[in-house]
Amino acid sequence: MARVKRGVTAHAKHKKVLKAAKGFYGRRKNTIRAAKAAVDRSKQYAYRDRKVNKRNFRALWIQRINAAVREFGLTYGRFIDGLNKAGIEVDRKVLSDMAIHEPEAFGALVNAAKKALEYLKETGTANEFEGAVR
């Protein structure tokens, strides 16, 4: 069996790592050892931050909804509770988008939530609420 030299493979691997390290500062973009460590770390950060990104967006949507709902005299928590009581299932991303781009439709949702909360306050139960979409 013929002897396999690893030079071509090693060179290809090094090129791949250095290409991934393009744009890094100092030795991290030139030397293979530093570049490999930096690329490995950057992949860990990317993995972690893909999860953090989802949390950040959810927090942003909640802040936007809260700001929009307060114009109608409700808090975010009361609004979400009212939507649940009314049987309206819309996620926070869509609610945030509606608050920005379709204020009339968002206002209708707020009024439905208010109505459900008032009905609950009057009767003490939300099970027989007429406006419920169940």
Curated annotation (Swiss-Prot):
Q: Which GO terms describe its cellular component?
A: ribonucleoprotein complex; ribosome
Q: Which family does it belong to?
A: Belongs to the bacterial ribosomal protein bL20 family.
A Pfam family of this chain: Ribosomal_L20
Tell me the function of this protein.
Binds directly to 23S ribosomal RNA and is necessary for the in vitro assembly process of the 50S ribosomal subunit. It is not involved in the protein synthesizing functions of that subunit.
The gene it comes from is rplT
Keyword check for Ribosomal protein: yes
Is this entry keyworded Lipoprotein?
no
Transmembrane portions of the chain: none
Single GO molecular function: rRNA binding
GO terms, biological process: ribosomal large subunit assembly; translation
Q: Which organism is it from?
A: Rhizobium etli (strain CIAT 652)
Q: Which Gene3D superfamilies match?
A: 6.10.160.10, Ribosomal protein L20
Recorded protein name is: Large ribosomal subunit protein bL20
Q: Give the keywords, sorted.
A: Ribonucleoprotein, Ribosomal protein, RNA-binding, rRNA-binding
Name the SUPFAM superfamilies for this protein: Ribosomal protein L20 (SSF74731)
